[in-house]
């Protein structure tokens, strides 16, 4: 029998535009196969029986989401997002007062694997702080001279990880940390950085490197390849 972790909900911030994709359509609404990237991302969350509800934070005035079949799903709630990612996540958290633990997942990350998600959810039994999916850095890392493209030095990649999503935290702790970080003008690039700012140390849960975020045009074809491969493996 699969493990169950009660009181788990999810927030998907989907109010961004993604100008690096060089399209007029926000990247989360680009299609892979017969579904949008957003639909793939949310479907991966709902495939786990522990996830009771998903709140999607969209841009005010968004007319695309309501046209998706996802908009009618009984476990989906939509709210207006904010100017920044942290604002959208907070808006989603406010719509989930019943949640004990909350996953936050990128709208443009469609290739989440269920085994990774299950191992992340297991943190609710062993941690009071939570953690994130992450992948160890494998490439040689270079730091550039400030404002230039010349190499300043090589960065030791030992103990360096790529932060992925979902990220998974107790709801009240995440609300408190995001609120404090925003009020104090801290730079928050993901949810874990808000906890770090407040003195907490979330866990790193090793995840698959093919859990990519679609950011640039070439990422779309790569995500399609990974999703197609995953479907073939499930049928095998």
UniProtKB/Swiss-Prot annotation:
Its EC number is 2.7.7.60. It comes from the Bacteria. GO terms for molecular function: 2-C-methyl-D-erythritol 4-phosphate cytidylyltransferase activity. Belongs to the IspD/TarI cytidylyltransferase family. IspD subfamily. HAMAP family: IspD. Homodimer. This is 2-C-methyl-D-erythritol 4-phosphate cytidylyltransferase. It comes from Klebsiella pneumoniae (strain 342). The gene is ispD.
């Amino acid at each position: 029998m699969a493990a169950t972790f009660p009181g788990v909900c999810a927030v998907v911030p989907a109010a961004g535009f993604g100008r690096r994709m060089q399209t007029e359509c926000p990247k989360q609404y680009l299609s892979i196969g017969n579904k949008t990237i957003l639909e793939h991302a949310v479907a991966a969350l709902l495939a786990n029986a522990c996830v009771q509800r998903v709140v999607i934070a969209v841009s005010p005035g968004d007319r695309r989401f309501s046209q998706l079949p996802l908009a009618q799903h009984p476990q989906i709630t939509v709210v207006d997002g904010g100017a920044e990612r942290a604002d959208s996540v907070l808006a989603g958290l406010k719509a989930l007062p019943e949640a004990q633990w909350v996953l936050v997942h990128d709208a443009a990350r469609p290739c989440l694997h269920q085994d990774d998600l299950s191992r992340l959810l297991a943190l609710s039994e062993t941690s009071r702080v939570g953690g994130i999916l992450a992948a160890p850095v494998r490439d040689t890392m270079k730091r550039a001279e400030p404002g230039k493209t010349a190499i300043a030095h090589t960065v030791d990649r030992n103990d360096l990880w790529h932060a992925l999503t979902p990220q998974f935290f107790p709801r009240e702790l995440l609300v408190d940390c995001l609120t404090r970080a925003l009020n104090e003008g801290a730079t928050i690039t993901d949810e874990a950085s808000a906890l770090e700012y407040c003195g907490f140390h979330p866990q790193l849960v090793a995840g698959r490197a093919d859990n990519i975020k679609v950011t640039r045009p070439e990422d779309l074809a790569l995500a399609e390849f990974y999703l197609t491969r995953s479907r073939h493996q499930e049928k095998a």
